[in-house]
UniProtKB/Swiss-Prot annotation:
The lineage of its organism: Eukaryota, Metazoa, Chordata, Craniata, Vertebrata. Glycans are attached at residue 122. GO terms for molecular function: carbohydrate binding; phospholipase A2 inhibitor activity. Residues 46-161 form the C-type lectin domain. One of its GO terms (cellular component) is extracellular region. It comes from Crotalus durissus terrificus. This is Phospholipase A2 inhibitor B1.
């Protein structure tokens, strides 16, 4: 929004500096201001639409984090790149309701996916006998949301985590 306002002011300033005195009634200024007001209203409407969608998705999942799949099957290294390019991150559920939202995506696609498990003592949902480093150094979640050690070379469902701080 600031960029739009600054662009409008720059255009107006350029117009005035170039000595255009053919606008004694201020028609150009009024036109620029009207355009800026329309853009501000459109931006506000878009922002409110975004918030509505975010709140609805959060309400439906019980989590402020959104877990989204592009339905591709990739290894861990490819997942890191895909999630970063999309503006998200590798899933890292920290609470039970976040893990449930993540597991819902896996159940819907009938697939397993990578996730990151922190060492900070936060919520984890390890399956019985896990973690087992012999199985690999990465972590995957099954369709029920239970965590298992796995190879980072496995090809699993691409799921990225997105969250918003507003």
């Amino acid at each position: 929004m600031r960029l739009i306002l600054l662009s409008g002011l720059l255009l107006l300033g350029t117009f005035l500096v170039n000595g255009h005195d053919a606008d004694p009634e201020g028609e150009v200024l009024n036109s620029v201001l009207l355009t800026l007001m329309k853009l501000q209203k459109e931006f506000t409407n878009l922002f409110h639409a975004f918030l509505t969608v975010h709140k609805a998705r959060s309400f439906g999942s019980g989590s402020e984090r959104l877990y989204v799949s592009n339905k591709e099957i990739k290894n861990f290294e490819a997942l890191k790149v895909i999630c970063k390019q999309a503006g998200g991150q590798i899933p890292s559920p920290q609470l039970e309701n976040q893990n449930k939202a993540f597991a819902n995506v896996l159940e819907r696609h009938n697939k397993e996916a990578f996730l990151v498990v922190g060492d900070s003592g936060n919520f984890t949902n390890w399956a019985a006998g896990q973690p087992n480093k012999a199985d690999g150094t990465c972590v995957k979640a099954d369709k029920q949301g239970f965590c298992h050690s796995t190879s980072c070379d496995d090809n699993l469902l691409v799921v990225c985590e997105f969250y918003f701080i507003l």
